[in-house]
């Protein structure tokens, strides 16, 4: 499992997956080429079969009556008309995968006549009149022309055999139907063209020249209605005699109109007529029939399909079915698009399996049982998509899958949070087992590193209870979702597996209660394909506009500096809220519960909307939330509060995000904890680092406070990730520091500043190793960076007088001898001083910058506005009303109301001639506890009353305002209402946290009071001894004694041993006794011979040190030389510090314990041991600076 945690191994797995996808595509292309060759061979066979049938019908056909024989000049179409007929004969079989029910023998004879008329006589045995322009064509020539004809012609001739029966197509085609019934024309006629474009009927077979634009669609729809069980079974019976009668009398109807056309070139007029009348050609828009001709055409079609009533009824049935089909299809598209837009990034659930004999038989049985044997098999939402349909979509999505894998590889090669996976591994109870089912003829993606052995005998049962639609969904528990192509069943072998199995078991029971047709469809669900979301749609989900953005529009008045600041601040706040609200949708790692809901609903969206799918989606959502909420969290202190906020509205999400930003700007640790618990940011150091660098609304000062806190390991990891995101290559030291300080304000306590500068210097050394080689010690970079910060503060601080500021010579003199006694090159120091003098080192603008600009434009301001948590919301021009029942002049009481997130500041404009300030301060009212209501009377149409409690009393301050228009008042009220709700909820959270802190303090004080009893009153009692031991153990556990900052001392104390009646110890020169068993190994562990009678001491006893002693790491030869000196120094130190070691209770036999409680020393900040710490290769660089400021040998 540890190999999974390696970033290169993860990248290799992604590359293997990408290779498998490429091989998949190559195999699919090879399969398509084979099927194209198969189609061409079938076309040749069908043309030969049609020709033999035509000859057979010509032999059986009686000689037509003399009056109905067409004149010798009657043209016949070109011999190439056979190809569309053959192609269309293949299309109903292979493109649609269905057969039309067989009809009696008269339609068979009619079909023979229909095929016989447009084709010339290939043999001399058939005695039919021919025109001088026509020549007999051999079957081989026709077959050659079929091969030369492009494949795009098959769609244009798709309706030549629409009304032909299967019996006329030969028995050879019927025997091959189960093998190729789902084959699509991949390159000549896609499924969309076959589904949406009605084909033209054979114009060349009818001498009347009328187009079958409506007739073709009518014929297709009649066939569909017959296959669907509609009450139109009389249509073939009525249609066949009419068509047979019309074909036996070809010149009776169309001779009046077709006569002038035949006077021209007979080989070109009929194709031209077909082009003019067919609506699928561009010529249809250039030539339109007159109203009389259209009416006559409709009348002829009605007569052709059995009369007016029969054709009207059939047309109504067809139109109703088609409209219902279009509505359901559009609704399915809309639902799929909405679900796809909510899916997280980098998720591509792709399940493809090659068709087997069982799947084809099941599909055929489904079609026969549902009565859908005659419908064109398009991509209808009620039918399961087949493998042939997935070929085209796999080709379209291949580029998206490659891009998704590229992003996954980039994420794996970047700084990866190993601690999440480590906690997942150490918990031991969360193991996911993947059972990859081999697919027929298609290589599945096998991820060896993700496989683990079954943890129990119940894994197989649980795997069987999981449906296939949720196999990729449970992968969200790994926080790293890749493209899944092969079918997978994942069983959860953890404590939550029982709840998952129960939820999904209920779903399975619900699925078994559905009808047989639905069971068959679900049984064939392995061939279904979940729709994939393009990366472009996933990157930018739609986010509603913020309320603050709506309130950005202000009333038209003279522009001022503060108003421009307000507009800029409001626009920035709108961007912050949109980023915060949309971040939970973008960050797939944070809102796994929401994503599980979307994935389960999207997997069920390919089926029809039924109650079973809704129940399954709800059950899967609960099961997945149970799995993911039980996973160990990295930084979430309370896992019960880390639930996905999927039920909250968009307004509540934005409010919670702003509350999280306010908490961060007040207390960074609490703010990060709140944002992680609400799912806005991931609980990994790299996720928090990206949040601090990219999101707006965070105070630069508080970012520095958070990153400079070296007491928490999580903060140190985040700082490492932050500096790793910055590139300082080929940059001067001051310019790199300027880039670093643009994101993080380096100020505050010296320890935090030192921590930030140390991390910066380490990163700069990594990016510029050639610069570091110029110095004798890499610590020179740290010293020089610190000197630049001091120079910038000295040069631009307003508290330092100009005559006392640091000059260039002072700066050079202060840096003398810092490079291990050597001076830094003068030109380097001069360049740094000049660049700092030209431009100040300062952070980028944040929300506090706008508040500061407003504060500087106000005169008489007593309240401090510039606070890290204060944010400007909007500014409105209102008019203060002293008495709501009296009319007053509005111009005399004009007020500029600035609404902050926790404060309402009321100002009035200053005269420009009298003062350089813009505003004069009037009032500042807090929003906590504020109530407001709108009023309207005969004097003021748009009024508002604000009531705020006064501090220290029960009275309330009441203010009345009115606005000129309703729009401005409405926007102000909306912002005010949201700000009051925000500050109220923030206060509730603060009170809850304060109560928790006080309860924790009371618990600790009670424990300490019980442990630190009166030592004089309980000096010799056993209870005092037990309490002293308990207090000592608690101190050890709370102090976190480490080998890096505490010295492991020995159990030797001569003075205490004599006082307590212990045996006399050996002389001071003798080595001390051995250490008690300690779980932490010490590098300086010595093994001298033990004393004869050592006193019994508790195993965790330590001697408190009064100063921090560095641990010196030596190699074996040096350790052998230093061993006598170290033992002598330790023994001397033990004898000299025995008085100060009395704080540790060492008990002798039969003597009372003298307990002197002293607080333990606080541990110093640990050394900066980053994985990418720069270690120079030179032999001269033998010293390194640690975070505590001291140096030690390496």
Curated annotation (Swiss-Prot):
Acts as a guanine nucleotide exchange factor (GEF) for ARF1. SUPFAM superfamilies: PH domain-like (SSF50729), Sec7 domain (SSF48425). One of its GO terms (biological process) is regulation of small GTPase mediated signal transduction. Residues 646-839 form the SEC7 domain. Residues 62-149, 229-272, 439-471, 515-610, 1002-1099, 1137-1175 are annotated as: Disordered. Expressed in brain. Localized to dendrites, as well as somas of neuronal cells. Residues 852-985 form the PH domain. Residues 1024-1035 have a biased composition (Basic and acidic residues). PANTHER family: GUANYL-NUCLEOTIDE EXCHANGE FACTOR (PTHR10663), IQ MOTIF AND SEC7 DOMAIN-CONTAINING PROTEIN 3 (PTHR10663:SF318). Interacts with DLG1 and DLG4. Interacts with GPHN. Belongs to the BRAG family. Transmembrane segments: none annotated. InterPro entries: IQSEC_PH, PH-like_dom_sf, Sec7_C_sf, Sec7_dom, Sec7_dom_sf. Residues 79-92, 561-572, 600-610 have a biased composition (Low complexity). Pfam families: IQ_SEC7_PH, Sec7. GO terms for cellular component: cytoplasm; GABA-ergic synapse; glycinergic synapse; inhibitory synapse; postsynaptic density; postsynaptic membrane; postsynaptic specialization of symmetric synapse. Residues 20-56 form a coiled coil. It is found in: Cytoplasm; Postsynaptic density. Residues 122-133, 1036-1052 have a biased composition (Polar residues). Its main location: cytoplasm. This is IQ motif and SEC7 domain-containing protein 3. Residues 63-78, 1064-1099, 1159-1169 have a biased composition (Pro residues). Residues 311-340 form the IQ domain. The modification Phosphoserine is found at residue 255. Keywords: Coiled coil, Cytoplasm, Phosphoprotein, Synapse.
